[in-house]
Amino acid sequence: MRLSILAKIIDMLSPRYCPVCGNRLNGEEESICVSCNLFLPRTDTWKDPYNNEMAKMFWHRIPIEKACALFYYKGHAFTSNILYQLKYSHRPEVATDLGILLAQEGMKVHFFDDIDGIIPIPLAPHRQRQRGYNQSEEIAKGIAQVTHLPIYTNIVRRNVFKESQTQKDRWRRNENVKEAFELYPSYRPDQEKGKNKSGSIAGRHFLMVDDVCTTGAVSYTHLTLPTSDLV
């Protein structure tokens, strides 16, 4: 990234820092410094997106076609700083750059072929107001910059937020997000019978984007809405 003169002045007045190591970023670096980016514990889910540890979370539960993750997350590891920064330190640009990195990996293996659009996992309204943005939507924006896929934020909404998923086991995670999502009231699947009807999502393939996938509970609940149009 080559900075303009104005951007360089802004960078001097308000320097940018790597969310992983905390070192100051130089003008050619994005949100994550070159060194930390190099050592991110990337997954190998790209090698077989139809048969990997993430995809297997959803086998026999929903008709998922493929799944991938950019890197492994472990609490108190250096990568945990990334999630902390984008969730609690108002760093939406970190999420966007992660989306770009993810999309660049996926483009190498044609992961996005046959995908019609992106649906970021929505936050509860009060959570989004507190945070100022939805980190999953910011990741989706980064993916869209590379793939040019449209982002849909008006199809699904989160109507319930009970408790944070952090520190919960698999069963409690599943219980915590039951009935947490719904289609927007304006969405009427019964009015979208025609295959070519403008705006219809029936029969289309969507990429669901979340920032962290631990047990797949949130994604599973999101994908089992009371309509087959999202599956």
How would you label these PLM feature ranges?
Residues 1-223, 228:
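Glycine-rich phosphate/pyrophosphate-handling loop used in enzymes and phosphotransfer proteins
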